[in-house]
Amino acid sequence: MTISREIDPAAKADIEKFERMLELYLNGELEEDRFRIFRLNNGIYGQRQGGHNQMVRVKIPYGRLQPEQLEMLAYIAETYSRGWAHITTRQNIQLHFVQLENIPQVMRDLNSVGLTTREACGDTVRNITGCHLAGACPYEVLDISPWAEATFRHLLRNPYSQRLPRKFKINFSGCATDCGQAMFNDVGVIAVMRPREDGTVEPGFRVFFAGGLGANPHAAQALEEFTPREQLLPTIEAALRTFDHYGNRDNKLRARMKWLLDTMGVDELRERILKERKLLLAATTWAEGIPETVQQAGDGPAGVSTAVDPTPVGVPVTLRLSETNPYARWEAVNVIRGVAKGTVSAYAHARLGDVTAAQFRGLAEIQRELGLE
């Protein structure tokens, strides 16, 4: 498959380094544990079937894919995997049974369409997830898509993202429905509004920290009532730096950020994050203002509190199914309309989370037909 886009220089350097490390490993010049850590930080899991079978995890920031990316996933699935891929609950795409010697070429193919496996695994900042209706939800305060993209770009290859005490997960939601599930992530961001003195409202965010499930589950805690848009990225990085400074590096079972709530307490952990943010904002190296990614794309909502037809998010379906045709029944429970932008979202269900190469290509074709490139 031929793609004209040039590979990003940083990504090219990553791939060349992976090739060098792989050669050393295959020649017996690099010990297993060292290569395993390096491999994981590049999004490559070794499978347990023996041999050189690998699982490749591709980050899909906030779950959004372009047609050429879907087509490339189809090509890789057919050429290097088993003809299909798997969607994860954190908006990654996983390809199984890829042979270790093919990994560098798979990375090149992915990077040629703007995708990466970098930091998809290991003790890193994992994929930045977001509400699946971002930009189309009729109740969103902000379109979180450009904010998730800006966060992804800021933290990818960031020095603080490389060797954390444990993995670090961030998500975004555009409204209080919280489709991004902020309450059980290391950092959860929900778009909110606060009143101005002139009677208008200011859009911004409410940031939550140190949530998690599994052993020792904790609901995330609010950092402050309102975080201005200009301070979102430094707030997220401050939480990351605090975790890097104080997280448990001796026991991986107690290394996630939620454990700091037990060792420090909510108030002290909150205070340290806010102190770290203050230091960041005072640094001459910090770029002030709204991130360029957000300025270029805009973050206007699809339609705040707009009446929609047929069924808005979170409202039970009241349609009498016996009185309508099959299409109307499907539309009533599967279609969301964002009035302000004229957007329409329709759900498609992937059985067991698996998507075939033909289905990837079919989605790409639909996107092109609708002008969604």
What are the residue ranges of the model-derived segments?
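Peripheral terminal and linker regions in Fe-S/redox and tRNA-modifying enzymes
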Residues: 1-373
